[in-house]
Amino acid sequence: MKEDQVVAEEPGFQDEEESLFQDIDLLQKHGINVADIKKLKSVGICTIKGIQMTTRRALCNVKGLSEAKVDKIKEAANKLIEPGFLTAFEYSEKRKMVFHITTGSQEFDKLLGGGIESMAITEAFGEFRTGKTQLSHTLCVTAQLPGAGGYPGGKIIFIDTENTFRPDRLRDIADRFNVDHDAVLDNVLYARAYTSEHQMELLDYVAAKFHEEAGIFKLLIIDSIMALFRVDFSGRGELAERQQKLAQMLSRLQKISEEYNVAVFVTNQMTADPGATMTFQADPKKPIGGHILAHASTTRISLRKGRGELRIAKIYDSPEMPENEATFAITAGGIGDAKE
């Protein structure tokens, strides 16, 4: 496959990827038996880093792993991984692995500092018809194209919670970028999630797939992240449980994005904010998911309608980009620049 060759040509990129995907089978050399390794893989833990990212308590909940075994596994994993501290310079070198996926609009990319970032969760929220699903579909195509900074392009996993995924839309967008329809559709793995639990289970499959084809997958899209939680947990009585389950899922997403160096893009809905009328806010709506989702998302983008097919994206929260706005258009070929 073409992506393999591109990645293989860059020795620096390859070394970094190697150290990123230390296979869990390496534990055999440190006295962990194959049966126990299989148990870890069954819950989506496929790398040494994955063990480091999982608490002892969570590992003890894996069927067939006793506390003594978990201690032994943790000890073996710690021998294989370097200690946790780096200088800021070393970390900045490590950050060079981070890539950006273009949104299809130069203005929008500029707003995001290059596009949708890997090793991070980017959340786009807005009312209906603000371009969230169109952006998801456009990213399915642009993530496959070679991009800036030696980005080789790669495959995508799309988890659909609202039945809004349309392969025909990808064909239209592929035409704009002059890419073969079948090749584009072949590189997108699609799954429909029916409940919030099912959504969580799919993430185990995602982790296994990312590990199996290390370095090939570049993007995970969930459209939309909160829809099923809204249905499965209704009313204030279930809010605490909903937020707890949501926190677990977002933590899993963060780990997947860092462990496999992929970009995670999620869309979110809006809700009326009953407290906003007291403070005379111009727009008394807010994204759902509360503080838990707000803290888990690395970059949050607010989308709103402009004139006609124009939409306005605003940085709502970002660790490095200033609060700013960009105007983009929804075209037949997906997200594009607004024509004056």
Swiss-Prot record:
GO terms for cellular component: chromosome; chromosome, telomeric region; condensed nuclear chromosome; lateral element; nucleoplasm; nucleus; site of double-strand break. ATP binds at residues 126-133. Keywords: ATP-binding, Cell cycle, Chromosome, DNA-binding, Meiosis, Nucleotide-binding, Nucleus. GO terms for molecular function: ATP binding; ATP hydrolysis activity; ATP-dependent activity, acting on DNA; ATP-dependent DNA damage sensor activity; DNA binding; DNA strand exchange activity; double-stranded DNA binding; identical protein binding. The keyword Acyltransferase does not apply. Changing residue 242 to A: Abolishes binding to ssDNA or dsDNA. SsDNA binds at residues 230, 233, 236, 242, 311. The keyword Calcium does not apply. Pfam families: HHH_5, Rad51. Gene3D superfamilies: 5' to 3' exonuclease, C-terminal subdomain, P-loop containing nucleotide triphosphate hydrolases. InterPro entries: AAA+_ATPase, Dmc1, DNA_recomb/repair_Rad51_C, DNA_recomb/repair_RecA-like, DNA_repair_Rad51/TF_NusA_a-hlx, P-loop_NTPase, RecA_ATP-bd, RecA_monomer-monomer_interface. DsDNA binds at residues 230, 236, 242. It is found in: Nucleus; Chromosome. Changing residue 233 to A: Abolishes binding to ssDNA. One of its GO terms (biological process) is mitotic recombination. Participates in meiotic recombination, specifically in homologous strand assimilation, which is required for the resolution of meiotic double-strand breaks. Double stacked ring-shaped homooctamer. Interacts with BRCA2. Interacts with the MND1-PSMC3IP heterodimer. Interacts with RAD51AP1; the interaction is direct and stimulates DMC1-mediated homologous recombination. Belongs to the RecA family. DMC1 subfamily. PANTHER family: MEIOTIC RECOMBINATION PROTEIN DMC1_LIM15 HOMOLOG, RECA/RAD51/RADA DNA STRAND-PAIRING FAMILY MEMBER. This is Meiotic recombination protein DMC1/LIM15 homolog. It comes from Homo sapiens.
